[in-house]
């Protein structure tokens, strides 16, 4: 029994080990199931179906970025062609190397985008993709994902972003070379064969062109011979001899010759018509202005090209006993001559090349569409001309006799539908032509740089306030002279290009004018647009950002205008040009050098904000300046993004006749600015309608673009030459928070710190004149005038009596 029990225990049942074929079959089934499951998951990721599909796609994007589709396709191919790919080592290696090159290229492109502020590569890449992953969205470009970031980071550190581009291209070329399994010799032979084929094709085309040219010459020569033969035969057939004199009758022969001419040379034959298409890049351009700096002396008007910077300073030694002349209230303060260089155009970034060649094909297509659309409405028109501008293309059409103009203008929406355009503006008619203009937006807007516009502008450099504004549809630069406007209203919605246009106008004036020729008063309630110009020598006072101070600052300008008119009256001139001419004549005949009055440009960047704080005072100041400031050399530029009637009132419009309208939201706003519709159809980004004082219809222009870097460069150039010299007479002073501007704007401070000194000087000399106060106290003309007014208000001196000197009403006391 024991033996049997032991035997039973040792004789256990053995398990059969699976065969090799069974193991391989099980692995094949596992691979098939895995491939099927992964295929389903990747399919949801490809079509991004639901939250699951988007999550799958974002997980793959986290790894390989925008190469997610390539990764999915490669994974599926590997799953189903595993055995075949094991035998293709060079193909797999080439694909992996090319994929690494693509990852580097995509990531280099990602970090060349200006919107990517954070340059920490791994952190920035993770933040971009994780934000989409958490929100179940696919919104941003992911570059090469985290794998691309890991590869790109050391390459960019060692070789920069451009070097990463080059290395990525090398990886792609190497990968394709390995995938193709070609030898170097095969590639060289292919390149040589391709080069020979191109050379043969070029030689064949050259021979064909030569043969065609010779054939045309032969045909033209044959036609000339036949035409000459026909003329001779007609002449011989028409010869008529006078029986009495035996002379040939020439007149009759010429008449018969005209009748015998073949129809192809008849003068009345009608040529085949084809509309003329003028491209923006081929439009006429003026020669660029020279960029060599011109050096000026502050006390002279004429340029001195060869001034040495180490010249001796010129200081005028004036005699206190100089008699007052007709030019009495002028600045005789000795001044140190400043060498000042005007900025040059090379401070601005060069413009990028523009290519609108593809617009020509679109224009030819639109010409046919326009004619067919008008024909479908029963209107017979012919497109005479098409001009491709920077932002729009203008089609000039000529309607048939009897077609009413309003029938064409009423079809703007139908034309926009037929042309698939954003909007269509119809100009009926074009000023000076018997044609109608149809303006259609281009597929791409060509940016007009400030440097390009300046170089092509024909503005007179002697006119300090003549500045280039933009380019018309025909590509010609358009300038305007602010002195003739004489004030300018700039209005449009947010982001339409107002501030860029104002910066362009300011920069243009700074390019031409010295600090003693033009002065600015800038009012910027937004505090960010004009603050860059602080501390330039052209400013009268720092940029005003407080709306309550702005109304007082405008009142100071009004006071300056009145003072200038009083000065003109004493001198006997009508405007600032006449006064400065008198100054030049005085300087030529006298050792005392007098400074001419500068032009003043008042710039308000946001009028609506001022009208909300002190509408009555601001409106009164603007109206007074608009009515009288032109002759005094004071000009205004008013900008607003809210062109409503409560901001641009009727009185302001009546006194600011020149307007610029940028894109607005409605025809009502357009009528508020221009008194007509049109601005609601503009495209934005500098597209404007310019209506100067001397034109009845607005002109469409593409304004120039000037970047913040360009503005900072020109401002830095000016600041390096001279410091700001602010005029206290224009300082609006301090305002309290409760001051609502009801006082009509700031007046003269109660007492000048030099009042007592000026009073003692007048009582001591028993003479009172602004020129004497200027000489003795070393102050400017404006401050001396204020001191004279305070002395008059205090009863020290009498009122002005024309050209007679003022009477001193007080006598000095022993204590004085």
Swiss-Prot record:
Cellular compartment(s): Cell membrane
InterPro entries reported in the protein's UniProt record: AAA+_ATPase, FtsK/SpoIIIE/SftA, FtsK_alpha, FtsK_dom, Ftsk_gamma, P-loop_NTPase, WH-like_DNA-bd_sf, WH_DNA-bd_sf
Record remark: domains: Consists of an N-terminal domain, which is sufficient for the localization to the septal ring and is required for cell division, followed by a linker domain, and a C-terminal domain, which forms the translocation motor involved in chromosome segregation. The C-terminal domain can be further subdivided into alpha, beta and gamma subdomains. The alpha and beta subdomains form the DNA pump, and the gamma subdomain is a regulatory subdomain.
Gene: ftsK
Topological domains annotated Cytoplasmic: 180-816
Coarse class of the protein's main subcellular location: membrane
Domain of life per record: Bacteria
Organism: Streptococcus agalactiae serotype V (strain ATCC BAA-611 / 2603 V/R)
Subunit relationships: Homohexamer. Forms a ring that surrounds DNA.
Job description of the protein: Essential cell division protein that coordinates cell division and chromosome segregation. The N-terminus is involved in assembly of the cell-division machinery. The C-terminus functions as a DNA motor that moves dsDNA in an ATP-dependent manner towards the difSL recombination site, which is located within the replication terminus region. Required for activation of the XerS recombinase, allowing activation of chromosome unlinking by recombination.
Bilayer topology: Multi-pass membrane protein
Molecular function via GO: ATP binding; ATP hydrolysis activity; DNA binding
Ranges that cross the membrane: 35-57, 62-84, 91-113, 128-150, 157-179
Protein family (similarity comment): Belongs to the FtsK/SpoIIIE/SftA family.
Family matches, as Pfam families: FtsK_alpha, FtsK_gamma, FtsK_SpoIIIE
Name the UniProt record assigns to this protein: DNA translocase FtsK
């Amino acid at each position: 029994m024991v033996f049997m029990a032991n035997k039973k225990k040792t004789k256990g049942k053995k398990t059969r080990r699976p065969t090799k074929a069974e193991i391989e079959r099980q692995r094949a089934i596992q691979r098939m199931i895995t491939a099927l499951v992964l295929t389903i998951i990747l399919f949801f990721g490809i079509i991004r179906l639901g939250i699951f599909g988007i999550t799958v796609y974002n997980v793959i994007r986290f790894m390989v970025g925008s190469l997610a589709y390539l990764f999915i396709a490669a994974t599926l191919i590997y799953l189903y062609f595993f055995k075949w790919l094991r035998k293709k080592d060079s193909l797999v290696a080439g694909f992996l190397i090319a994929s690494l090159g693509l990852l580097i290229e995509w990531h280099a492109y990602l970090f060349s985008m200006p919107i990517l502020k954070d340059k920490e590569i791994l952190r920035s890449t993770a933040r971009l993709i994780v934000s989409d992953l958490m929100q179940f969205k696919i919104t941003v470009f992911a570059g090469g994902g985290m794998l691309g970031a890991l590869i790109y980071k050391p390459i960019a550190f060692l070789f920069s972003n451009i070097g990463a581009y080059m290395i990525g291209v090398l990886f792609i070329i190497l990968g394709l070379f390995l995938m193709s399994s070609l030898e170097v010799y095969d590639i060289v032979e292919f390149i040589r064969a391709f080069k020979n084929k191109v050379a043969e094709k070029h030689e064949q085309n050259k021979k064909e062109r030569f043969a065609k040219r010779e054939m045309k010459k032969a045909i033209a020569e044959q036609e000339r011979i036949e035409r000459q033969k026909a003329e001779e035969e007609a002449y011989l057939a028409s010869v008529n001899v006078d029986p009495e004199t035996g002379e040939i009758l020439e007149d009759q022969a010429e008449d018969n010759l005209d009748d015998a001419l073949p129809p192809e040379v008849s003068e009345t034959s009608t040529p085949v018509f084809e509309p003329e298409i003028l491209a923006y890049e081929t439009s006429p351009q003026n020669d660029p202005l020279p960029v060599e700096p011109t050096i000026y002396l502050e006390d002279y008007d004429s340029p001195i090209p060869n001034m040495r910077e180490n010249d001796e300073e010129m200081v005028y030694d004036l005699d206190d006993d100089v008699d007052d002349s007709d030019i009495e209230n002028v600045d005789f303060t000795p001044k140190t001559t400043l060498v000042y260089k005007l900025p040059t155009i090379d401070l601005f970034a060069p413009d990028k090349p523009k290519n609108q060649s593809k617009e020509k094909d679109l224009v030819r297509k639109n010409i046919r569409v326009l004619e067919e659309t008008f024909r479908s409405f029963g209107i017979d028109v012919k497109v005479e001309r098409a001009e491709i501008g920077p932002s729009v293309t203008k089609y000039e059409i000529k309607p048939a006799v009897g077609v009413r103009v309003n029938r064409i203008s009423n079809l703007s929406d139908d034309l926009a539908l037929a042309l698939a355009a954003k909007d269509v503006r119809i100009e009926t008619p074009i000023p000076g032509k018997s044609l109608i203009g149809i303006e259609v937006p281009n597929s791409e807007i060509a940016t007009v740089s400030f440097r390009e516009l300046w170089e092509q502008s024909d503005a007179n450099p002697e006119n300090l306030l003549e500045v280039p504004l933009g380019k018309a549809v025909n590509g010609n630069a358009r300038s305007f002279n602010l002195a003739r406007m004489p004030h300018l209203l700039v209005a449009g919605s947010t982001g339409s290009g107002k501030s860029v246009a104002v910066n362009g106008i300011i920069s243009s004036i700074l390019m031409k004018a010295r600090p003693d020729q033009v002065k600015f008063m800038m009012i910027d309630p937004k505090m960010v647009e004009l603050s860059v110009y602080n501390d330039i020598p052209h400013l009268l006072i720092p940029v005003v950002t407080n709306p309550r101070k702005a109304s007082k600052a405008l009142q100071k300008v009004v006071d300056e205008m009145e003072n200038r008119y009083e000065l003109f009256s004493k001198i006997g001139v009508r405007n600032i040009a006449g006064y400065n001419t008198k100054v030049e004549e005085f300087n030529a005949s006298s050792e005392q050098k007098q400074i001419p009055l500068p032009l003043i440009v008042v710039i308000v960047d946001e009028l609506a904000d001022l009208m909300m704080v002190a509408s009555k005072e601001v409106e009164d100041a603007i109206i007074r300046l608009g009515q009288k400031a032109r002759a005094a050399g004071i000009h205004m530029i008013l900008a607003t993004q809210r062109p409503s009637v409560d901001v641009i009132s009727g009185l302001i419009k009546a006194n600011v006749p020149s307007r610029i309208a940028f894109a607005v939201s409605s025809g009502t706003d357009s009528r508020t600015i221009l008194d007509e519709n049109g601005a609601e159809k503009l495209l934005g980004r500098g597209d404007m309608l310019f209506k100067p004082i001397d034109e009845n219809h607005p002109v469409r222009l593409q304004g120039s673009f000037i970047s913040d870097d360009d503005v900072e460069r020109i401002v830095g150039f000016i600041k390096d030459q001279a410091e700001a010299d602010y005029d206290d007479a224009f300082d609006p002073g301090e305002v309290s928070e409760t001051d609502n501007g009801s006082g009509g704007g700031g007046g003269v401070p109660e007492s000048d710190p030099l009042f007592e000194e000026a009073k003692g000087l007048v009582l001591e000399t028993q003479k009172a004149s602004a020129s004497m106060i200027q000489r003795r106290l070393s102050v400017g003309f404006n401050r001396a005038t204020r001191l004279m007014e305070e002395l008059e208000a205090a009863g020290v001196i009498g009122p002005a009596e024309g050209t007679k000197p003022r009477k001193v009403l007080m006598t000095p006391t022993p204590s004085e």
